[in-house]
Amino acid sequence: MIVVSDTSPITNLAAVGQLDLLRQLYRTIVIPEAVYTEMVAAGKPVPGAVEVQTLCWIQVQSIDDVQRVAALQSSQNNIDLGEAEAIALALELKAELLLMDERRGRVLGQSCGLNVTGLLGILLQAKRKGLIPLVKPVVDELIEKANFRLDNQLYVTVLGSAGEAE
């Protein structure tokens, strides 16, 4: 299974000590060079920066079609370089899944025919596979430690999907 990730699923999971969920769920994650650069050359410590440099199951790959990246960035969705490269790489590799949290990038990825899931979808899948006992404590920790933002309705919906009360 080819899975491409944008920055935020990696940094958020690393911030709460749950990065290994990606390996357990997908075995290997591919990130574009722009995502690697966002994390490693940020000028300040970023959760997951050391891991993307050292873990063999996170692979960095360059984009072949730079014109596609430019077209994605100039689209009306106003996405950043990391998101554009993640979408382009997922298309190039014919990835089964793109991991991305930013709404505009998710919408653009889906409009390109990609299967896209975000951090909350990852956590729901991890619970279904028995990798975490509960979603709520992880989401609460993401909100507290990683400044993860989600509205209350989505919070309630996710907990309902997980079979957990608020």
Can you describe what each PLM-predicted range is?
Residues M1-L97, R103-R106, Q110-L114, Q153-L159, ...:
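Active-site-proximal, substrate-binding regions of enzyme catalytic domains
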Residues R106-E166:
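Acidic, PIN/NYN-like endoribonuclease modules and their adjacent C-terminal/linker elements
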